[in-house]
């Protein structure tokens, strides 16, 4: 018996509605689905990056002196690892640049070793250190790759740490400004993008509150270690205060003496999270905003408005330094761009009871419980690109829509994991799609840097984790670099103009060797939706959508 037309119509409407809902779900979760390099502005750059200590090696050669990273590693706090060899970028920079060229990168973000360039922290320049940085920069430019240089990435010369305590002393402002001028003078004719300090918020918390990264200062009961050197209740605030003053001193020096001749830009990078309330209660919503004040506003509010967030000043009291009127004016507006570092999201609940404690550190002052990824785990991050889009929109709304580079993003895997890294492709596809969505929201994003190139040594508690586009064979005397699957078939293809979609990732996972297309059985839309559904189920992803952006479907979907 034939079905009545009304029944068939209702069935068709249901199928179409279901498919539309699923499409909206997947695109909302993973960001823009089908896109190519051509969908981004012409001046938008795609790059990768790393840091000097994690990639250069040659730690004891050609005049370089120890940094606080060396001291940390040699003391046994890096699970037996150190940066003595790393990826041997000091000797293999030409090979690395050729790999960048083959990958299709527009830009390379790297840091310069302070103790290699200025072995005494200040004073005479080391000719060998100068030559290495010049060689790297020239090699990049000769291959059409834009250099983005970071002045400081956790590697203060140990001599300055020994002399006056490094970042907890105001003397650092003088020495950092001197160091910055050496870099501007020597390399500024070719380097246009300068990041003064990499993720000062994370550096301060790890180095001065928990003590699990250099310079390993903390005090009980807040230490993650057995050390008792330092004071966790105020040193994180003091270190960031001096970082902000050092940054602004260097930025204004550049603007005053070099910008008109070199036409470059100075910024700073910040580690961010997508921060969402654990429940819909008023207390948790307020706590999530307070957590963002502490993580991001700690750096951005002085740069944008000249002072720390009110919540920080209220909860930390006299333990957080105050800016003088002159310092406030110097710090306010002292950036041309902001580097955003983003990997994952956090959920937050209120913990105002922590404020009753007389002895408090940064975490207690924040008065919030944090739920989310274990930053020291080998487990892969959940795929949560909507958090990045939300964060980019907050920069637009709260801080005047500054020029932004995504300075770090990527997926962590065990360092000995398979080269068939389709999971990295999934997260990269989602996050680049989220950046494209944010651009369409009118966020002022200038570039996206994947972490890391080629790979790097993680000298901290998370040593077994790799973020690299290439696998570096540490057992090979030549440190052979092998491209991972998605680098070969995803990143390179996208950067060279090929369109990418979630369907490509599904097909790549089904046939990672040939990346061949499966037979066309369904219509294009049905096949795309099927791939999307299988993608969501197969990977047992847990999505929690707490504060949807306008036009998106609010939901809480927990799968397995």
UniProtKB/Swiss-Prot annotation:
Subcellular location(s) of the protein: Peroxisome membrane
UniProt effect for mutating residue 408 to A: Loss of function
Cytoplasmic side: 539-560
Gene3D superfamilies on file: Glycosidases
Glycosylation positions in this chain: 34, 226, 231, 347, 416, 489
Catalytic residues as annotated in Swiss-Prot or TrEMBL: 199, 408
GO cellular-component term (any): peroxisomal membrane
Domain of life: Eukaryota
Functional pathway: Purine metabolism; urate degradation; (S)-allantoin from urate: step 2/3
Top EC class, one word: hydrolase
Signal peptide: 1-31
Intrachain disulfide bonds: 218-223
Keywords, in A-Z order: Disulfide bond, Glycoprotein, Hydrolase, Membrane, Peroxisome, Purine metabolism, Signal, Transmembrane, Transmembrane helix
Catalysed reactions listed for this entry: 5-hydroxyisourate + H2O = 5-hydroxy-2-oxo-4-ureido-2,5-dihydro-1H-imidazole-5-carboxylate + H(+)
Database matches in InterPro entries: Glyco_hydro_1 (IPR001360), Glyco_hydro_1_N_CS (IPR033132), Glycoside_hydrolase_SF (IPR017853)
Pfam name, any one: Glyco_hydro_1
Similarity field: Belongs to the glycosyl hydrolase 1 family.
Subunit structure: Monomer.
Protein name: Hydroxyisourate hydrolase
Gene (UniProt): HIUH
């Amino acid at each position: 018996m034939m079905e009545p037309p009304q029944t068939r119509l209702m069935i068709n409407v249901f199928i179409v509605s279901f498919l539309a809902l699923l499409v909206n779900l997947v695109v909302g979760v993973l960001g823009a689905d089908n896109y190519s390099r051509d969908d981004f502005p012409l001046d938008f750059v795609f790059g990768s990056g790393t840091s000097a200590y994690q990639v250069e090696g040659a730690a004891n050669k050609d005049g370089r002196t120890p940094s606080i990273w060396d001291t940390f590693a040699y003391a046994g706090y890096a699970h037996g690892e150190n940066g003595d060899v790393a990826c041997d970028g000091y000797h293999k920079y030409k090979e690395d640049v050729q790999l960048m060229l083959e990958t299709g990168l527009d830009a390379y973000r790297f840091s310069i070793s302070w103790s290699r360039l200025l072995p005494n922290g200040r004073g005479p320049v080391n000719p060998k250190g100068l030559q290495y940085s010049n060689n790297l920069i020239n090699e990049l430019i000769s291959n059409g790759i834009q250099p983005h240089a970071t002045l400081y990435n956790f590697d203060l010369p140990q001599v300055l740490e020994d002399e006056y305590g490094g970042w907890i002393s105001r003397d650092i402002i003088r020495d950092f400004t001197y160091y910055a001028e050496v870099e501007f003078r020597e390399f500024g004719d070719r380097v246009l993008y300068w990041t003064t300090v990499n993720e000062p918020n994370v550096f301060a918390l790890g180095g001065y509150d928990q003590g699990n990264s250099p310079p390993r200062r903390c005090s009980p009961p807040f230490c993650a270690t057995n050390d008792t050197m330092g004071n966790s209740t105020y040193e994180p605030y003091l270190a960031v205060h001096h970082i902000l003053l050092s940054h602004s001193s260097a930025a204004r020096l550049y603007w005053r003496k070099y910008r008109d001749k070199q036409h470059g830009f100075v910024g700073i990078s910040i580690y961010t999270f997508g921060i969402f309330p654990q429940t819909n209660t008023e207390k948790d919503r307020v706590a999530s905003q307070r957590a963002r004040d502490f993580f991001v506003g700690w750096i951005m509010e002085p740069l944008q408005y000249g002072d720390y967030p009110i919540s920080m000043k209220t909860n930390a009291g006299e333990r957080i330094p105050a800016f003088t009127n002159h310092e406030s004016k110097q710090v306010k507006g002292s950036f041309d761009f902001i580097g955003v570092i983003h990997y994952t999201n956090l959920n937050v609940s209120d913990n105002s009871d922590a404020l009753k404690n007389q002895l408090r550190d940064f975490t207690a002052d924040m008065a919030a419980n944090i739920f989310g990824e274990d930053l020291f785990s080998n487990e892969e991050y959940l795929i949560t690109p909507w958090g990045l889009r939300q964060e980019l929109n907050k920069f637009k709304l709260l801080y005047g829509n500054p020029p932004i580079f995504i300075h770090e993003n990527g997926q962590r895997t065990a360092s000995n994991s398979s080269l068939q890294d389709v999971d990295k492709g999934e997260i990269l596809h989602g996050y680049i799609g989220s950046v494209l969505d944010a651009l369409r929201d009118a966020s002022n994003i200038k570039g996206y840097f994947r972490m890391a190139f080629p790979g790097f040594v993680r000298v901290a508690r998370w040593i077994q984790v790799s973020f690299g586009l290439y696998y570096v064979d540490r057992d090979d005397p030549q440190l052979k670099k092998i491209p991972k699957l998605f680098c070969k078939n995803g990143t390179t293809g996208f950067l060279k103009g090929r369109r990418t979609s979630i369907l490509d990732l599904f097909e790549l996972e089904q046939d990672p060797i040939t990346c061949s297309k499966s037979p066309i059985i369904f219509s294009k839309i049905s096949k795309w939706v099927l791939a999307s559904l299988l993608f969501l189920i197969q990977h047992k992803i847990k999505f929690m959508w707490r504060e949807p952006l306008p036009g998106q479907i609010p939901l809480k979907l927990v799968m397995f």
